């Protein structure tokens, strides 16, 4: 007679697929072990989830059970585990050092005293850190089997194993006869051993057949997997003569497979060919199947590829149809698509540092090619997200938008900058380059000042503008009316030029009118200066020196050597601030302390340039013995309303009181406009 245990092991080895459901019965085993330990020691361990392992994490329950097994072994005649373990049972926190020490003590006892195989052992981290709960459960089941041989209470699964073993060892003529030898020793408790709790009886098998039929009825295939009932809890599966033992463990239908247990659902998934080749019977299982249904588009497109990225993913949608079919069915009118919601003329991508000519080169030559290729096919170097396939796309940017883009870029550029770097770049379209350069020359003009003080308007491309850079444009003589005529013929106003660019464009005047305007401004400055000097001369401030014998003026600042308007403003501001003698005196007539020297910074100028400190008196001893000395004064600035600089400077020696005279700087501005009025032009 063949060994029945070998037949059960062979049925597990002949499965269609590898054994992957070893974790399916872990939850059922944890529930069984929790009930077993609660019955032995009156604990309150939860059966499901992480509560069971959390209750065992301290190791006290494990060590307590080890001592119980040792005491049961002492009652036997055979020398079984002869030494217990010492452990800490009070104030133990899961994950602490004492908890780890208790778990390690139990592991050492199982390995040395109980002789548990190494394949069923677990490590400390497996229980404390939940790294491998399956090993913990299998080790506890093995310890329960060893304890059941000594007369201890066994879990329900161990009782099922004992029932199955008795049924397999029973002879056919006498099925009710008890097994002899080792089986009697294992199941009967040792004499004299006290009862350790109520004995758990096997569950009733009356509902087992109904549960099995319910699980088999989930498969709706015409040719179902055969599972024939031989007796209570014994079934023959498939076309072979292999027998399986089925038991009910609470809400789980368990199957005895080899030396362990498995659920009936996973057992059928491994052995039923219909369940192996289809995923309809296992919707919650994440296993990889041999057949994976793919999404197929209901309408096939005649083109192999679509220029719109992502159209393959939307091919299964019924409302998406090919362009060719859409044109034949609906005519020239195209139904709305998600891509049609984008603006019709998307702006080209501009990077920081791009010049105007580089932007025009990106829109001149390649623009026509892109507009021609948009509606023909998927020929693209880089797929654009804003292209549409319904109708031929229009050019991405009309010529009018070219000037608008230049205006946007010129907002952050200085007005006095010379020709941009775009003039040195090669442009594919010469006509567009010439037209864009002419617009730049007409729109941006620079003020050029010669050595003799003459001012004139110069196009940006003709002069360096003080920056030292030159452009390859050829200087051309233009008449005063030429820019206006060319500007009217320019297509920019017709195509919607930005109004802001018109206001930023300097006024174009005739050179003669410019010179006449400058002369009027100079005459107005001189007239105002004379009027202010006349008002200031009414106040008695001391003898006014003769302009003919005025001392040599100090070297003025280099920033005002070539600027006629700036020097004129110096004289005006000097007259407004009054005489320096008034500012250097106090209420009692004595000279006050010298005022703080002004900074040379153009942003921190003084509103009164004539004020600088006490001046030399003609009759004072210091004026006779010491030659005239030039005092450092603050540079005049274009911002007279600003306060003087706070930078401290050394103070000079005080001079005795006496009649003050006009400062040399004020005398210079009061004489020079009268003496040489034509030199400023």
Swiss-Prot record:
Keyword Nucleotide-binding attached: no
GO annotation (BP), single: negative regulation of microtubule depolymerization
Span of domain Calponin-homology (CH): 27-148
Biased composition (Low complexity): 186-199, 354-365, 475-493, 557-571
Protein species of origin: Homo sapiens
Role summary: Involved in the cross-linking of microtubules and microfilaments. Regulates microtubule dynamics and stability by interacting with microtubule plus-end tracking proteins, such as MAPRE1, to regulate microtubule growth along actin stress fibers.
Modified-residue entries (Phosphothreonine), positions: 193, 334, 391, 498
Location within or outside the cell: Cytoplasm, Cytoskeleton; Cytoplasm, Cytoskeleton, Stress fiber
Stored PANTHER family: GAS2-LIKE PROTEIN 1 (PTHR46756:SF16), TRANSGELIN (PTHR46756)
GAR domain segment(s): 203-275
Subunit structure: Interacts with MAPRE1.
GO molecular function: actin filament binding; cytoskeletal anchor activity; microtubule binding
Omega-N-methylarginine modified-residue sites: 487, 504, 633
Protein name: GAS2-like protein 1
Alphabetically ordered keywords of this record: Acetylation, Cytoplasm, Cytoskeleton, Methylation, Phosphoprotein
SUPFAM superfamilies to which the protein is assigned, alphabetical: Calponin-homology domain, CH-domain (SSF47576), GAS2 domain-like (SSF143575)
Cellular component terms per the entry's GO annotation: cytoplasm; stress fiber
Region (Disordered): 168-204, 278-509, 536-681
Composition bias type Pro residues, residue spans: 542-556
Polar residues bias (residue ranges): 291-303
Similarity comment: family membership: Belongs to the GAS2 family.
Gene3D superfamilies per UniProt: Calponin-like domain (1.10.418.10), Gas2-like domain (3.30.920.20)
Modified residues (Phosphoserine): 306, 316, 352, 355, 394, 436, 438, 479, 486, 490, 492, 657
N-acetylalanine, modified sites: 2
Pfam families: CH (PF00307), GAS2 (PF02187)
């Amino acid at each position: 007679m063949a060994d029945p245990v070998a037949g059960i092991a062979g049925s597990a080895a002949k499965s269609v697929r590898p054994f992957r459901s070893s974790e399916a019965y872990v939850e059922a085993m944890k529930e069984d072990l929790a009930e077993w330990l609660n019955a032995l020691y009156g604990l309150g361990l939860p059966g499901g989830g992480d509560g069971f392992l959390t209750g065992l994490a301290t190791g006290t329950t494990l060590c307590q059970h080890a001592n119980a097994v040792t005491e049961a072994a002492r009652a036997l005649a055979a020398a079984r585990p002869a030494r217990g373990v010492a452990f800490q049972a009070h104030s133990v926190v899961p994950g602490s050092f004492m908890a780890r020490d208790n778990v390690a003590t139990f592991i050492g006892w199982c390995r040395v005293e109980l002789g548990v195989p190494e394949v069923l052992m677990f490590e400390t981290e497996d229980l404390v850190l939940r790294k491998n709960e399956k090993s913990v459960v299998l080790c506890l089941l093995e310890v329960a089997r060893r304890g059941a041989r000594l007369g201890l209470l066994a879990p329900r699964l161990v009782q099922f194993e004992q029932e199955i073993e008795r049924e397999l060892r029973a002879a056919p003529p006498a099925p009710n006869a008890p097994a002899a030898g080792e089986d009697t020793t294992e199941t009967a408790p040792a004499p004299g051993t006290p009862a350790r709790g109520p004995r758990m009886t096997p569950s009733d098998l009356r509902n087992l057949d109904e549960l099995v039929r319910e699980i088999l009825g989930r498969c709706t295939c015409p040719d179902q997997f055969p599972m024939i009932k031989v007796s209570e809890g014994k079934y023959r599966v498939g076309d072979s003569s292999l027998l399986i033992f089925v038991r009910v463990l609470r809400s789980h239908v368990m199957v005895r497979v080899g030396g362990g247990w498995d659920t009936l659902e996973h057992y059928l998934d491994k052995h039923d060919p219909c369940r192996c080749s289809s995923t309809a019977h296992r919707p919650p299982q994440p296993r990889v199947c041999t057949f994976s249904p793919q999404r197929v588009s209901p309408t096939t497109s005649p083109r192999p590829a679509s220029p719109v990225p992502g159209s393959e993913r939307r091919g299964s949608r019924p409302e998406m149809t090919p362009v060719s079919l859409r044109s034949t069915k609906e005519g020239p009118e195209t139904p709305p698509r998600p891509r049609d919601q984008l603006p019709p003329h998307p702006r080209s991508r501009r990077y920081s540092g791009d010049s105007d000519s580089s932007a025009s080169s990106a829109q001149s030559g390649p623009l026509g090619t892109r507009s021609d290729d948009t509606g023909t096919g998927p020929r693209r170097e880089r797929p654009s997200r804003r292209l549409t396939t319904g109708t031929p796309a229009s050019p991405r940017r009309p010529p009018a938008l070219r000037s608008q883009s230049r205006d946007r870029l010129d907002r952050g550029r200085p007005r006095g900058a010379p020709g941009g770097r775009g003039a040195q770049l090669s442009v594919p379209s010469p006509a567009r380059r010439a037209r864009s350069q002419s617009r730049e020359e007409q729109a941006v003009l620079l003020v050029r000042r010669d050595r003799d003080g003459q001012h004139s308007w110069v196009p940006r491309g003709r002069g360096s503008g003080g920056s030292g850079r030159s452009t390859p444009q050829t200087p051309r003589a233009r008449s005063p009316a030429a820019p206006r005529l060319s500007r009217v013929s320019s297509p920019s106003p017709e195509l919607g030029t930005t109004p802001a660019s018109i206001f930023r464009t300097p006024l174009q005047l005739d050179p003669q009118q410019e010179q006449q305007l400058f002369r009027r401004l100079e005459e107005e400055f001189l007239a105002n200066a004379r009027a202010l000097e006349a008002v200031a001369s009414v106040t008695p401030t001391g003898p006014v020196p003769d302009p003919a014998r005025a001392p040599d003026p100090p070297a003025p600042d280099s920033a005002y050597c070539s600027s006629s308007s700036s020097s004129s403003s110096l004289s005006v501001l000097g007259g407004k601030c009054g005489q320096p003698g008034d500012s250097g005196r106090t209420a009692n007539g004595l000279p006050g302390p010298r005022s703080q020297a002004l900074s040379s910074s153009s942003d921190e100028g003084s509103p009164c340039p004539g004020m600088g400190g006490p001046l030399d008196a003609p009759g004072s001893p210091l004026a006779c013995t010491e030659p005239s000395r030039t005092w450092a004064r603050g540079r005049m600035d274009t911002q007279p309303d600003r306060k003087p600089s706070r930078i401290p400077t050394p103070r000079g020696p005080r001079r005795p009181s006496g009649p003050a005279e006009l400062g040399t700087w004020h005398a210079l501005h009061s004489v020079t406009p009268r003496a040489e009025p034509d030199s400023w032009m």
